[in-house]
Amino acid sequence: MLLLTFTLPVVTLLLAHIIRSWFRLRHIPGPFWAKITDLWREHHYIKGDYGDRPMAPYFAIPSLLGMESAMDQIQQELEDQICRRVTIDVVLWMRLFSLESLHWIAFSNKLGYLSEGKDTDGILSILQSKFIGLAGQLCGWIHRTTLRFHFPKSCTGTAVAPSQRKASHRDLLAHFMDASQKNPETLEERGVLGATISTIFAGTDTTGTSLTFFMYYLIKHPAALARLQEELDSAVRSGNLSYPPKWVEVSTLKYLQAVFKETLRLHSTARMSLYRVVGPEGLDLCGERLPSGTNLGCFGYTAHRNEPIYGRDAALFRPERWIEASNDTLLSMERASL
């Protein structure tokens, strides 16, 4: 009975997906199976020109810097909310900030998370449950179906509306729409919405978590906090740090960058094994011979605590390692960072 209860909804979803796919593709001439599956799309992925390539320029630093000023008001709103409180839930507020920021960058629209101080329509709850990630691991059709049913309409509605008109300024949606118009065969219009929403899903949890641990380690290590405060104060006194701070300014603050790198080293946002394919010559690793074509993966937790690369104190939070390292050692540490 329990097995039937579980399998019946799955079979129903599978049949619904097949029927929907058949009606969507039935007019396309070609092999029979092309009418009930979109596996034929895989040649775009093999060629490397499906989706990612048309959008890649918009994730480059020059393009992202064009959105920097749009973040100032979100940053100011976070500061105002924090100043009104004696204590704050850092985990919650960093996630609210990252979600509000990414939604503003993507759609030029505020969700009201910071002003309300809570998860108003349940996006954070969805991320916390890992529902979308698990569904995506199971099967593509489950992922597409569940994403459609569970993503709040407050976001999808905001995303769809601008697609009917010219964007007033250059947010991510406007950039992706341009990419779709220039590359209609490799980036469909419906893919624009998916790509924009995926950016929010991918960035909210990782950004919020990174900011949370950034503050956690500074609070836990007063000496590091004091050194960072001195660097910031010195930059302000010398006129090298404005308010709100700019990326070109903070990117030159060595200790600040070291703290960020050390935080991401100890708490990487990549919580999965990132695979690489062994080259034609094969690979000898830990006494084992791995043949060409083997998928070899390693978790960031393990790679980032590799003592031959990061030192005997690799398990400790010590931002100074990024400043004291020789050029060769620094290059090795950065290459090992996942």
From Swiss-Prot:
<comment type="function">
    <text>Cytochrome P450 monooxygenase; part of the gene cluster that mediates the biosynthesis of fumiclavanine C, a fungal ergot alkaloid. DmaW catalyzes the first step of ergot alkaloid biosynthesis by condensing dimethylallyl diphosphate (DMAP) and tryptophan to form 4-dimethylallyl-L-tryptophan. The second step is catalyzed by the methyltransferase easF that methylates 4-dimethylallyl-L-tryptophan in the presence of S-adenosyl-L-methionine, resulting in the formation of 4-dimethylallyl-L-abrine.</text>
</comment>
<keyword id="KW-0560">Oxidoreductase</keyword>
<keyword id="KW-0349">Heme</keyword>
<feature type="glycosylation site" description="N-linked (GlcNAc...) asparagine">
    <location>
        <position position="240"/>
    </location>
</feature>
<dbReference type="GO" id="GO:0004497">
    <property type="term" value="F:monooxygenase activity"/>
</dbReference>
<dbReference type="GO" id="GO:0020037">
    <property type="term" value="F:heme binding"/>
</dbReference>
<dbReference type="InterPro" id="IPR050121">
    <property type="entry name" value="Cytochrome_P450_monoxygenase"/>
</dbReference>
<comment type="similarity">
    <text>Belongs to the cytochrome P450 family.</text>
</comment>
<dbReference type="GO" id="GO:0016705">
    <property type="term" value="F:oxidoreductase activity, acting on paired donors, with incorporation or reduction of molecular oxygen"/>
</dbReference>
<feature type="glycosylation site" description="N-linked (GlcNAc...) asparagine">
    <location>
        <position position="327"/>
    </location>
</feature>
<dbReference type="GO" id="GO:0035837">
    <property type="term" value="P:ergot alkaloid biosynthetic process"/>
</dbReference>
<dbReference type="GO" id="GO:0005506">
    <property type="term" value="F:iron ion binding"/>
</dbReference>
<keyword id="KW-0408">Iron</keyword>
<dbReference type="InterPro" id="IPR001128">
    <property type="entry name" value="Cyt_P450"/>
</dbReference>
<feature type="signal peptide">
    <location>
        <begin position="1"/>
        <end position="16"/>
    </location>
</feature>
<keyword id="KW-0732">Signal</keyword>
<keyword id="KW-0503">Monooxygenase</keyword>
<dbReference type="GO" id="GO:0044283">
    <property type="term" value="P:small molecule biosynthetic process"/>
</dbReference>
<keyword id="KW-0017">Alkaloid metabolism</keyword>
<dbReference type="Pfam" id="PF00067">
    <property type="entry name" value="p450"/>
</dbReference>
<protein>
    <recommendedName>
        <fullName>Cytochrome P450 monooxygenase easK</fullName>
        <ecNumber>1.-.-.-</ecNumber>
    </recommendedName>
</protein>
<dbReference type="InterPro" id="IPR036396">
    <property type="entry name" value="Cyt_P450_sf"/>
</dbReference>
<dbReference type="InterPro" id="IPR002401">
    <property type="entry name" value="Cyt_P450_E_grp-I"/>
</dbReference>
<comment type="pathway">
    <text>Alkaloid biosynthesis; ergot alkaloid biosynthesis.</text>
</comment>
<keyword id="KW-0325">Glycoprotein</keyword>
<keyword id="KW-0479">Metal-binding</keyword>
